[in-house]
Amino acid sequence: MGDSHEDTSATVPEAVAEEVSLFSTTDIVLFSLIVGVLTYWFIFKKKKEEIPEFSKIQTTAPPVKESSFVEKMKKTGRNIIVFYGSQTGTAEEFANRLSKDAHRYGMRGMSADPEEYDLADLSSLPEIDKSLVVFCMATYGEGDPTDNAQDFYDWLQETDVDLTGVKFAVFGLGNKTYEHFNAMGKYVDQRLEQLGAQRIFELGLGDDDGNLEEDFITWREQFWPAVCEFFGVEATGEESSIRQYELVVHEDMDTAKVYTGEMGRLKSYENQKPPFDAKNPFLAAVTTNRKLNQGTERHLMHLELDISDSKIRYESGDHVAVYPANDSTLVNQIGEILGADLDVIMSLNNLDEESNKKHPFPCPTTYRTALTYYLDITNPPRTNVLYELAQYASEPSEQEHLHKMASSSGEGKELYLSWVVEARRHILAILQDYPSLRPPIDHLCELLPRLQARYYSIASSSKVHPNSVHICAVAVEYEAKSGRVNKGVATSWLRTKEPAGENGRRALVPMFVRKSQFRLPFKPTTPVIMVGPGTGVAPFMGFIQERAWLREQGKEVGETLLYYGCRRSDEDYLYREELARFHKDGALTQLNVAFSREQAHKVYVQHLLKRDKEHLWKLIHEGGAHIYVCGDARNMAKDVQNTFYDIVAEFGPMEHTQAVDYVKKLMTKGRYSLDVWS
């Protein structure tokens, strides 16, 4: 097929010459342009078939690229650059740690966002003596690149640049509960080698379902000796605490120049301008916030955010991201325990004047604002934070304890895992449990990671609700092993967002929409099988609303099946009335609900799938049905997938391995889609 297309394109100039009297110059130009586009498409389609498929997410506005990171490295005397593909900030944090490590080996490193540079410049990297490029690449969702690595991934797919002489290493961040574990890290590692680059250390694969921090430390402690051996250098000293930012206190600053929680542009919340994205969120008013379940054990809620006049567009299956705020009680306690005035206006300025990152968070601001809106104070701190903090513990035993947990020894790793990670000790808890640990608040703010946006599957259809985005969420609250009660940052914050607001003022939520590949079939007549227990029902509320809307427009709509699961019908049956109405009206062909705690034996969604196996097989094999699974990745999604393997094997009929291939092909064709989390 490829050859026939090449032959056709080769004859185009001759054909055009013969017909010149029949076509105008404009016709010829347009015709040639079309043929050129088709030829380009077929060439690159063939290339893309040889590598894993990632779905491209369109960004609203392409960022401005710097001219050359190699020239910048030359100018600033760097020989190591660490690029990061980061969605939640962890890969960026690891990249910063690696670039900071370089000084111990007589080298100079810099971390960089691939979105800010032209990666075609990689071929010029060998011009720098003993140069090395490292990639810390996270995989997002079902095998996708992170938003900031999308352009880099596209370039890797299409380029044929010769990277001979380029030395590289890759550390991937993934989660084994997902189907495509560390797909991005694996692809970057493989593709760089294909292009001629030389791998100087093995690919690292971090697993967030296990202990990502330990995976990184283990890889890192073997990575640097390999770098030393390859380049013939020696470590110049032990790891030491080096401040990256300097504190500047502003005595008489105009408050109009002070950040109060904005993510990007100063005063962007007062003067909102589209397009809205992660760096420019929209302040949406909460119009509805109602509890969905009975009882007091858990709080499941439905929120509606007003996006009128925002020009935000979304489709069923997209995600809404919200920027939460930390609990003011925790913020005040940190201020009290450190004896700090939280309302001091300050800036943390990068000591490296050549760095693109001038501040760790928007500055100037106050400590209160930083701890409330910009810094993560509720997740267990990583080992590098403990190492830096240890110097401020005046009690030797506490300092030793912190140093041990920050070490790479087996005992230290076990201690960190049990005392920090498994006990879910956040920074306030550590300060409370170590009475002599009293770091300067500015250094603490430098060390803490950024507070990240939280993503939720949109629970509405824009066809029905074009001016609002709906969220379905459960308020997270649990008792940690330390005996403390921990609460989820975003869900606890959202829970307080009442439509009336305080003193009659509107409750506002900074938000933006992230496009997804979790999409209804193009043809409304295609049957859909939706599996979503608990809050996994959220995107299906949008799907069902849209299918109902299509029916109202007089369109023929295929079978719409929902497999939903909850504990008890009188406790946590979400959207019970709405689902019953859709079922009664015929928009929902089947409403199948599994109650796990309503009878002696537990019933889950996979049990109902097995019950309906013959009909499901007919819909899949003969009707071309699309399958959608949303919810827990660790257990539910795997159990459901195994159930479909069994159904396919039984009615195929075929061997188990063939059934697995059958389902995997459904995934490749976009007929088996996942929106899962762990």
From Swiss-Prot:
Where does the record place the FAD-binding FR-type domain?
A: 279-521
Output the Pfam families linked to this UniProt entry.
FAD_binding_1, Flavodoxin_1, NAD_binding_1
The cofactor named in the record is: FAD; FMN
Q: Which GO terms describe its biological process?
A: carnitine metabolic process; cellular response to follicle-stimulating hormone stimulus; cellular response to peptide hormone stimulus; demethylation; electron transport chain; fatty acid oxidation; flavonoid metabolic process; negative regulation of apoptotic process
- The reaction(s) this protein catalyses: 2 oxidized [cytochrome P450] + NADPH = 2 reduced [cytochrome P450] + NADP(+) + H(+)
Cite the binding residues for NADP(+): R298, T535, S596, R597, K602, V603, Y604, V605, Q606, D639
Q: Where, per UniProt, does this protein localize?
A: Endoplasmic reticulum membrane
> Highest taxon of the source?
Eukaryota
Q: Which UniProt keywords apply?
A: Acetylation, Endoplasmic reticulum, FAD, Flavoprotein, FMN, Membrane, NADP, Oxidoreductase, Transmembrane, Transmembrane helix
Q: What is its EC number?
A: 1.6.2.4
Q: Which residues lie on this side of the membrane: Cytoplasmic?
A: 44-678
Could you tell me the membrane topology recorded for this protein?
Answer: Single-pass membrane protein
**Main EC class of this protein?**
oxidoreductase
Listed under GO cellular component are: endoplasmic reticulum membrane
Functional description taken from the UniProt entry:
This enzyme is required for electron transfer from NADP to cytochrome P450 in microsomes. It can also provide electron transfer to heme oxygenase and cytochrome B5.
Protein's name according to its UniProt entry: NADPH--cytochrome P450 reductase
